[in-house]
Amino acid sequence: MLALKQALSLVSTKVAGGAAWTPTDEGKLEAWYENKVGITRNGSTVSDWADQSTNSRDMVQADATEQPAYNTVTGDLTFDSSNDTNLQTTSQMSFSADFTLGIKMFPTSTNGTFVADNTTANELFKISADDAITIKIDGVTAILSLDTGEFDDDYIVLTRVSDVFTLYRNGVAQSNPQTLAGTIDIDAIGIRRTDVNGFDGTIQEVQIYSISNATLTANINARLSTL
């Protein structure tokens, strides 16, 4: 794993002037919920995770009983399905073409939705098994499985290029791409419509783009590997 992280750090593209890549370098960045940044706390929980893109799609939760817990050291947001903890934005994101989602998370149970829509039904990304992610778009389902092992404290990238989804786990593309067309709708972290299939575990960062290419995937992997 150390060798993998070192290799990924070497592929991180530099922008003009020699600065390290960040998601805001991408013109097609739709939302960025950055680790340890943009957090509004309500005691030990999070009421607002501010979007670090220019789109102001903050993820918020006014109900204190549904706010995820926050770890000030790691930047972990802990979600608990028994309390329906979640964050939502009023600015729904919709993607009918290429798409990339990067996330650093540690699921502790299955059937948990990490990113989805709590306004439109049948739109979700969830941990459906110890080794599988289910994607549902416009009510149609695809399942992306790991080649080996089970989900743990991982950084995950999901790409869609010409309607073909690929799952990357800790920088490694898994060998079971799936075809799934339709319009992806997203407005929530940790829950789907209506307030079901809540996520159990921690989430450190979420990045969402309306584009996908190999360089972007490498850069996301390189960044998430450092968290």
Q: Model-found features: residue ranges?
A:
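Extracellular glycan-interaction patches encoded by glycine-rich segments
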Residues: 136, 183-204
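Beta-strand-rich interaction surfaces with strong enrichment in secreted/lumenal proteins
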Residues: 90-92, 143-148, 178
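Localized edge beta-strand/strand-to-loop motifs within extracellular or lumenal beta-rich domains
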Residues: 107, 150-166
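Extracellular glycan-recognition modules
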Residues: 41-44, 48-49, 58-136, 164, ...
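Extended recognition patches within non-cytosolic domains
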Residues: 5, 10-29, 41-42, 174, ...
